[in-house]
């Protein structure tokens, strides 16, 4: 298994799919990285030479991925909560942020139903 950005990328998959195992890299960004490095999308990760893998690591290193991206997202959410803006309040109360109805539905965000005590 090739190690890129601290992640073991599966050898048996095509390069375009294998790179999506890294948090922060989807199909579009994966295709852009491969186009910039000149690697064919259908090449398997296991078939890449060490020099090519180094070029790929450098290209992936230009983007914010994995731990840095996760940290950035959590800090952004924390910043919204500290500001006390509408989105921050919705995060704090574990409710949907983008205007969805909450009278019914929204169970995924709100969690399991709380029983009514009589």
UniProtKB/Swiss-Prot annotation:
Domain of life: Bacteria
MF GO annotations: rRNA binding; structural constituent of ribosome; tRNA binding
Swiss-Prot/TrEMBL keywords: Ribonucleoprotein, Ribosomal protein, RNA-binding, rRNA-binding, tRNA-binding
GO BP: any one term: translation
PROSITE patterns xref list: RIBOSOMAL_S13_1, RIBOSOMAL_S13_2
Pfam families for the chain: Ribosomal_S13
InterPro entries for this protein: Rbsml_uS13_C, Ribosomal_uS13, Ribosomal_uS13-like_H2TH, Ribosomal_uS13_bac-type, Ribosomal_uS13_CS
Subunit structure of this chain's protein: Part of the 30S ribosomal subunit. Forms a loose heterodimer with protein S19. Forms two bridges to the 50S subunit in the 70S ribosome.
Protein family according to the UniProt entry: Belongs to the universal ribosomal protein uS13 family.
Protein role: Located at the top of the head of the 30S subunit, it contacts several helices of the 16S rRNA. In the 70S ribosome it contacts the 23S rRNA (bridge B1a) and protein L5 of the 50S subunit (bridge B1b), connecting the 2 subunits; these bridges are implicated in subunit movement. Contacts the tRNAs in the A and P-sites.
Name of the protein: Small ribosomal subunit protein uS13
């Amino acid at each position: 298994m090739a190690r890129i950005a601290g992640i073991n990328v599966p050898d048996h998959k095509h390069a375009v799919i294998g790179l999506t195992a890294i948090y922060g890299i989807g199909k579009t960004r994966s295709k852009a990285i491969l186009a910039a490095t000149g690697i064919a999308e259908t090449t398997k990760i296991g078939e890449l030479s060490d020099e090519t893998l180094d070029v790929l690591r450098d290209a992936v290193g230009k983007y914010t991925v994995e731990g840095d991206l996760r940290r950035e997202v959590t800090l952004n959410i924390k910043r919204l909560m500290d500001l006390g803006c509408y989105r921050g309040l919705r995060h704090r109360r574990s409710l949907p942020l983008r205007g969805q109805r909450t009278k019914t539905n929204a169970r995924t965000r709100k969690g399991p139903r709380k029983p009514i005590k009589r």
